[in-house]
């Protein structure tokens, strides 16, 4: 994976800060690179303008990542948040991401629910969180069956325990969602 701009984890900041066009321009100089995974909403707020920039540099989009982890509102989860308003906003983010992906000419949206989990035992109601998350993903994916939603699992970070933290749980989760356009990023 190559990041074309600034990235930050909980320990440090890496790379040079670049706007979207600068990142696309740098990526276009990499031999063999013809497409990018772009991030909504941090990198792409206007898919038509983004498409013009990509075309200018001869680049495409392989996938659009919907970021439901990097803002304070997602602190207690997105699709599993105990707050129905936060869950509804996560669904809207996913729907917007699906629309943007279609405009950008790709048929895949990636998402990792990294703030959906816990730091301490018994911190949240797992059954409620799981069922709420299934309902949210089902609603978003049903909105655009022509675009695939690829869900990424991760054991931890930023949570000590992400609740969809391995391939088995994520495969079961996708089975419960029950839609052909929902799968697992391996």
Question: What is the meaning of each model-derived region?
Answer:
Residues 1, 38-40, 63-68, 111-113, ...:
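A cross-domain feature marking catalytic cores of carbohydrate-active enzymes
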Residues 1-96, 102, 179:
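N-terminal pre-domain/capping segments
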Residues 56, 60, 76-183:
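Active-site acidic/histidine proton-transfer and metal-coordination neighborhood
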């Amino acid at each position: 994976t190559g990041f074309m701009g600034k990235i930050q984890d909980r320990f440090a900041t890496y790379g040079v800060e670049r706007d979207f066009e600068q990142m696309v321009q740098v990526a276009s100089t990499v031999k063999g690179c013809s497409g990018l995974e772009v991030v909504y909403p941090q990198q792409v707020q206007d898919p038509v303008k983004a498409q013009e920039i990509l075309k200018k540099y001869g680049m495409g989009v392989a996938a659009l990542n919907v970021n439901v982890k990097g803002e304070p509102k997602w602190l207690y989860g997105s699709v599993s948040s105990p707050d129905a308003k936060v869950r509804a906003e996560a669904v809207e983010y996913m729907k917007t991401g699906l629309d943007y992906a279609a405009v950008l000419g790709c048929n895949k949206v990636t998402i990792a629910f990294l703030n959906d989990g816990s730091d301490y035992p018994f911190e949240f109601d797992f059954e409620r969180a799981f069922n709420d998350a299934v309902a949210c993903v089902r609603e978003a994916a049903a909105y655009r069956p022509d675009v695939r939603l690829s869900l990424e699992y991760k054991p931890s970070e930023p949570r000590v325990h992400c609740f969809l933290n391995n391939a088995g749980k994520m495969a079961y989760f996708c089975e419960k969602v029950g839609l052909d356009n929902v799968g697992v990023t391996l």
